[in-house]
């Protein structure tokens, strides 16, 4: 099938995946642009966003642009970052205390932007995501308004021509 949904979400670690993923098969260069209007508070560092995947198998090469609440106790602190798994069954970027500050994220090699305004107190403002594939380069951008974009980062990941985006 060229589009569908992978369902699940119990536990994921650096080498396995387990999450909800609605996807479409794309060929070659592609991009996805979407707005995240709100998110449910679940746990520290829970990811929500968009991604390119080489396959639907756990451990697939991945470029994922999204955001995570840094601490569940502080509902206004969100970080937008570009995570990646460079090799099949390799480790994905460690999304934990590494995204609590731009300095920690930089040490961990995780591109991060922390000054977008996704949420103000109890009000959701939303955040736009744009993830682009050009050859083996994946570049992520984020925006408060969908017009002015801030580059989050880029990763080079060798992937097949046909990959999944969602």
Protein language model features and the residues they cover:
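Extracellular glycan-recognition regions
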Residues: 1-166
């Amino acid at each position: 099938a060229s589009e569908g949904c992978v369902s699940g979400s119990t536990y994921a670690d650096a080498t396995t995946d387990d999450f909800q993923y609605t996807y479409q098969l794309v060929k070659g260069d592609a991009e996805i642009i979407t707005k995240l209007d709100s998110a449910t508070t679940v746990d520290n560092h829970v990811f929500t966003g968009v991604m390119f995947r080489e396959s639907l198998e756990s451990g697939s090469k991945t470029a994922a642009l999204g955001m995570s609440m840094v601490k569940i106790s502080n509902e206004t602190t969100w970080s937008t970052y570009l995570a990646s798994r460079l090799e099949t069954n390799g480790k994905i970027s460690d999304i934990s205390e590494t995204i609590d500050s731009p300095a920690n994220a930089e040490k961990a090699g995780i591109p991060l932007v922390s000054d977008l305004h996704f949420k103000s107190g109890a009000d959701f403002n939303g955040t736009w995501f744009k993830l682009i594939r050009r050859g083996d380069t994946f570049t992520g951008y984020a925006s408060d308004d969908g017009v002015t974009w801030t580059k989050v980062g880029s990763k080079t990941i060798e992937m097949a021509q046909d990959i999944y985006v969602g």
